[in-house]
């Protein structure tokens, strides 16, 4: 009988070890599947919302309808963005080309606070190096034109009350694993 009890005991130990091994294999399988899912999610990650365009770490929204400059500023705020503030020549080139395809569009530049002193909606002033982007003879304030738009191959000042397309900008999200 003693031998029989010993065999039963060994059989139970063996079953426990086998069960433990199966549990470990299940855990490893779940971990592997989880790692694969994380990898797939990262590939699906979008740094910008749908209908936005990514360029050099920023997201740009090109409106599908027109409104005046102030309403455009507010529309961008509602999207947790701002009417586009241009920070580089590359960005200017990208926006100018894209806006040419879509139509005249507001940017976040105006001289509403003080005539002739152009400021971006983020409070920064227009750099001298960007003056080259004004179309010939612009800005001219011909008709109380205090807001800037993309027009043709450059910038134009226009009355802020005119309805135009508009471009919002915000930082792109990171898709890296944390």
UniProtKB/Swiss-Prot annotation:
SMART domains in alphabetical order: CLECT (SM00034)
UniProt cross-references to CDD domains, sorted A to Z: CLECT_DC-SIGN_like
Disulfide bridge map: 48-59, 76-168, 147-160
Domain C-type lectin: 54-169
Residues carrying sugar: 70
InterPro entries xref list: C-type_lectin-like, C-type_lectin-like/link_sf, C-type_lectin/snaclec_domain, C-type_lectin_CS, CD209-like_CTLD, CTDL_fold
One MF annotation (Gene Ontology) recorded for this entry: metal ion binding
PROSITE patterns attached to this UniProt entry: C_TYPE_LECTIN_1, C_TYPE_LECTIN_2
General function of this protein: Probable pathogen-recognition receptor. May recognize in a calcium-dependent manner high mannose N-linked oligosaccharides in a variety of pathogen antigens.
Protein name, as recorded: CD209 antigen-like protein C
Taxon lineage: Eukaryota, Metazoa, Chordata, Craniata, Vertebrata
